[in-house]
A protein has these predicted regions:
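Sec-dependent bacterial lipoprotein signal peptides
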Residues: 1-22
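Exposed beta-sheet edge and beta->alpha loop/turn motif
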Residues: 96-138
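Short helix-adjacent coil turns
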Residues: 45-46, 50-57
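Short solvent-exposed beta->alpha transition segments
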Residues: 57-106
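Short, low-complexity N-terminal intrinsically disordered segments enriched in polar/charged residues
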Residues: 24-48
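Alpha-helix termination/capping residues and helix-transition junctions
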Residues: 18, 52, 85-88, 129
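A short, local hydrophobic-aromatic micro-motif
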Residues: 22, 89-92, 133
């Protein structure tokens, strides 16, 4: 019962965060001010931070407007999934998405990360200050 509740909360958080970062005006080109290299490098750092079990450090990477919705209860299912995948092996393929919405610019990378027991596909999105606005692992 407890795991279902946490899974549901994680799904709701992922949906809310995705709504903030994805909208009608999506394109594959990154907006001015973002580069593929900077987004990729920051995503790698944020994925490694999330994997490190440093909840407070990972939470601090999110935009201020999202801080209150990031809880240990939504973080734990991610750690559980990570434990099932085993040790990190390598960062794999990437795809980049950019968006401008209501005067704000966003960039995201879809990153396939290889682990000993499989892969996790991350969608990691950033605002103009390179603060996290989306972190989905599936």
């Amino acid at each position: 019962m407890m795991k279902k509740r946490y899974g549901w909360k994680l799904l709701v958080l992922a949906a809310l965060v995705a709504l903030l970062a994805v909208g009608c005006s999506k394109s594959s080109k990154l907006p001015e001010g973002f580069t593929e290299e900077s987004v990729k490098t920051q995503a790698e750092a944020d994925i490694k931070l999330a994997e490190s079990n440093d909840f407070e450090g990972w939470k601090a990477r999110f935009a201020d407007s999202l801080q209150s919705s990031i809880t240990e209860e939504v973080y734990q299912p991610y750690l559980d999934m990570l434990a099932k995948k085993g040790d990190f092996e390598s960062f794999g393929k990437t795809a980049f998405v950019g968006q401008e919405k209501e005067g704000q610019k966003y960039a995201a990378v879809i990153y396939v990360v290889k682990y000993a027991e499989g892969e996790i596909k991350y969608t990691v999105g950033y605002d103009e200050d390179m603060k996290l606005v989306q972190f989905v692992a599936q």
